[in-house]
Amino acid sequence: MADKIKAWFDAEADYLEVRFSDAAGYEKETKHDAVMERVDKDGQVIGFSVMGVSKFTKGNPLEADLVAA
């Protein structure tokens, strides 16, 4: 597990990004339309992003599994 994470929110784009590592990586689709995984060259999850994050509320939370191959 990462010692630190980096997270930022772009209100205009309604976009949240969370990174567990600064390692080079790429975005990969998940089963959830709003979520993308960020994986490194070995396929390890090093972060994720959420589009349309404001539609997820306490009564309608986002639930997604981050599973890299």
Name the predicted role of every residue range.
Residues 1-69:
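Small, basic N-terminal interaction modules of short regulatory proteins
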